[in-house]
Amino acid sequence: MWWASRARWLFSALLDVGGVGLRARRRTASSGLEITGSCGGELQGELDRFGGISVHLSRHRTLHRLDAAAFRRLLQAAIQQWRAEGRIAAWLHIPILQSHFIAPAASLGFCFHHAEPHLSTLTLWLGEGPSRLPGYATHQVGVAGAVFDVSTRKVLVVQDRNKLKNMWKFPGGLSEPGEDIGDTAVREVFEETGVKSEFRSLLSIRQQHRSPGAFGMSDMYLICRLQPRSFTINFCQQECLKCEWMDLESLARTKHTTPITSRVARLLLYGHREGFDKIDLSMEELPAVYTGLFYKLYHRGLPERYKAEMGTD
């Protein structure tokens, strides 16, 4: 999703930090040129390339002496200075042990942007018109692995222990931050079943909004085709009620499964009979436009002559 990637990029850029001092510093992306600007009041921060300022309260060791009222006066003076300097936004990073500063910040117009285990981030739009700050992550990502043994035509399935209905499904779970899709599938399959596997392709993507399992946010559920590297089952009894190698046609026909599992089982049947190139979304790593970064691109197979004739992005 290009728009989600751009929002994450913009967010990280807004949080880009430089040195901390009595004067905040901004470093341009290309030349490394430093541009200085004063911080309001006694609160020190860093200017970003978009004209916003980030303030990390953990770096202000004298704040522990202030009560909520004194902090509010300090922050109010800083906001006035930032407006005078033409700043467009303020990002306030508050450690959990300084959460008593959240209420005074909120009274001055700050709103929650996101929270981490030991830190909350608040924002205040200082520019003209409605806020143009990017939102935080919009989706959680779950990945399952369809481990299919082509020699026996069997696929690895589990029944979750904590579900209301005992339906057969592919083992899987939530992706960790910075973890590739294929790596999530392989890891989750091993953690739940004890079976080792290798990523082959992406098979399907399901998007569901207002998902109860995602705290009411949107949920992306991806199913990967995996090739088994071991076959002995040693499943996690805390997570799984049952685990077995099931005949693929039986999984496609049974009523004791979810619609998405049944559909992917039929995809696997089609791929096994007609060729997996008919169903696979293969992965290729390509260089990003950002220096030193790479990304994974998933798509149907592209003949080499098209790559050669048209070039690559």
Curated annotation (Swiss-Prot):
Top EC class of this enzyme: hydrolase
GO annotation, cellular component aspect: cytoplasm; mitochondrion; nucleus
Pfam families: NUDIX, Nudix_hydro
Tissue and organ distribution: Detected in liver and in brain (at protein level). Detected in liver, spleen, lung, brain, hypothalamus, cerebellum, pituitary, heart and skeletal muscle.
Motif, Nudix box: chain positions: 173-194
GO MF annotation, one: NAD binding
Domain of life: Eukaryota
Alphabetic keyword roster: Cytoplasm, Hydrolase, Mitochondrion, Nucleus
This enzyme's EC code(s): 3.6.1.-
UniProt GO BP: negative regulation of cell cycle; negative regulation of cell population proliferation
Domain Nudix hydrolase: from-to ranges: 138-270
Stated family: Belongs to the Nudix hydrolase family.
Additional note from the record: This protein is coded from a FGF2 (BFGF) gene antisense transcript.
Function: May contribute to the regulation of cell proliferation.
Protein name: Nucleoside diphosphate-linked moiety X motif 6
Species annotation: Rattus norvegicus
